Amino acid sequence: MGTKDGKGIKILAAIGLIITTIIWGSAFVVMKNSVDIISPTYLLALRFTIAAIALILVFWRKVMKINKSDLFCGGLLGVFLFVSYFFQTYGLKYTTASKNAFITTLYVILVPFLHWFFNHKKPKRNNIIAACIAVVGLALLSLEGDLSINLGDLLTLICGFFYAVHIVFIDRYTTDHDPVTMTVLQMVVAAALSWIIAPILEGPFDGRVIDNTMMIGLLYLGIFSTMIGFLLQNVGQKYLTPNTSSILLSFESVFGLIFSVIFLGDPLTVRLVAGCAFMFAAVILSEYRKKTAS
């Protein structure tokens, strides 16, 4: 029996991914304040570094057992992760936050086809329809104003593509490798790449901008949003298909909306409620035929 067959473990894995999206959704509030003070790539470097150090301290026994195969697979996942975050961050400089959020989550529609391409597993019809419904929901949640295409949109589309690749390869590598080990290596590689790129693009880092309040925000991003969030994603994806995982992870937009309404005072409109309804419908449809077939 494969790791993706047990109902109980699949439910726990799905709950883990939902918790991840709640954490990531709340991170929008923290990021909104942090990016105004710390430049984007240095912010990535700090959050990935905090996560990497914390993971190594907690799971040092697993770190001591890392082999060459782990290094290759985890390192490649780290590259995909860094590239997706890098292009999302710089895409945001040239486009609106709403378009950036929407285009990033187009990985929902890309994952079934990339999973087919890389792993030779053809997506079921209900998975494709569910992904399309999720895109409609994401559009209702994210898009507003000018819908023209600009440089920022293209950069963000690259982000969405690499995040889709990241999801597909997590599915591939966590089948034969420990997901915790994969998470540790991803954080280390993403942190290293961030520290290499940041000085080139943004000059030397000014540590004086980090006060006590900023440190609390950085610790939240590093420990909760990055360490715990990606740990739950990597472990959860071991027991779920990439198609199901991508739709569940896209709920980051739903929880981002909820936290923005609660903490930032953003208005809750009928359009946003409809977007949430489409998202829930996509999840139900993505699993419906599996249940009737069992």
What do the PLM-derived regions correspond to, one by one?
Residues 23, 27-28, 56-104, 140, ...:
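Specific transmembrane alpha-helical segments of multi-pass solute transporters/efflux pumps
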Residues 44-46, 100-106, 170-192, 223-262:
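Helix-helix packing/entry segments at the starts of transmembrane helices
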